[in-house]
Amino acid sequence: MKRMVYLVACLPFWLTSCEEKVTALHFNEAEQVFEIGKESELRFLNETFEIKDKNMEAQTLLTDAGKEIPADEVRIKLVKDIEISGEWTPIKFPVREFDGNGHTITFDGIRVVIEESSKGVFDVGLFEEMGGEKEAVVKDLTLAGDMTIDAQKREDGYSLLAGSLAGEFKNGCIENCTSKVDISFADNKGICTLCPGGLVGDLDSYGSEVEVALRGKIINEGNLTVNPCSDAYIGGVIGRATNYGKIFIKENVCVENKGDLTVQWKADAQPDHSYIGGVVGLFKTNETDIEHLHNWGNIRLDTQNTSATFNIGGVCGELTPHNYERIYPLDLYNAGNIEIKHDLLAEFSAIGGVIGSFGGSSFHQVVNEGKIIVSGKGCKYISGLLGSESSIHGNCYLYSCCVDKVGAYPVWNISYHPVTKQVPCKENHPTNQK
């Protein structure tokens, strides 16, 4: 009987230890996709990348029939929910398509460690980066659980792009993806240039003719915690969206954040500009329409009485075009509170219920229902909708369909462009707000 109990108790260990090593992935010939349903198969993507000496052009993926598929043709489809645990190295292998197929990848307390002896720029997420010269598509995927980024051993300055999906997404499309991942970051020194988002750290296009599109429901429900910080672009969904190409967020799309952002600044940080937004930290793009960005998460910032300049908005910390082109925001909504602990000492810090710093835009249906709570000394650029007008990005128009439902501050601050004004709206706008 004792021997029987011992065998039963050890069975899970034996099953795990005897699991066959992955040497190839099953390839569905009918659909022309690799099928993945195990953690070991996800990790195999990195093992393959390392074997190929990290030469991106030489990357291929081996099928279970012995055929090599070039990386720019690799399409992956999840066939089961997957749970990842322990230390995680973000996937470096470039894929053309990653189809979640309605499944969930759960991070079970995973840790990503930033080592002292390693490089100076890091991309952290399920993937390190996606897209590039060849576009990537990610669709119908849910990410859940929690991820800790540990940089406490680091002594030298470095840059970090982080999101549950990818640190960087350069070119392609993200469609119907949800993150429920709680992300926490700590380095104890505040020596990092930090760009975290709930889903993607940095959303960028590879060149002026390249497009990045968000489609369907793009949702973050995870909380983001940063401590300490000294130079940052922080967003509930995307940390930074900036390019010289086009980012399409319009029509049949809704980008939503429902997670809280909690940020503590480094007390002796340099007086640099930093950006915090409920949906996007910094949004800087060429002429385009931007539609249906919604935030329900709270933003909590402890300034530690630093002299840093903050641009903070319930939806975007800053929203401006590149150069002197124009952008056309429609249906930007905030219901989350912005809570500032300690003083805002920098003269040009800007806080808006929806957007912190703005310029070169025509605003329709910008709505705020969240409170701005400043416990210490405030700044002169605090507004119910739009914090402060940028001095270098042309005039703006705020249409009458825009409203601050709290009413504790002026709707916006304008001082640079004499033709910037509020104007009547005659449109009958649809809305994706719940």
Locations of regions flagged by a protein language model:
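C-terminal motif of bacterial Sec signal peptides marking the signal peptidase cleavage site
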Residues: 15-17
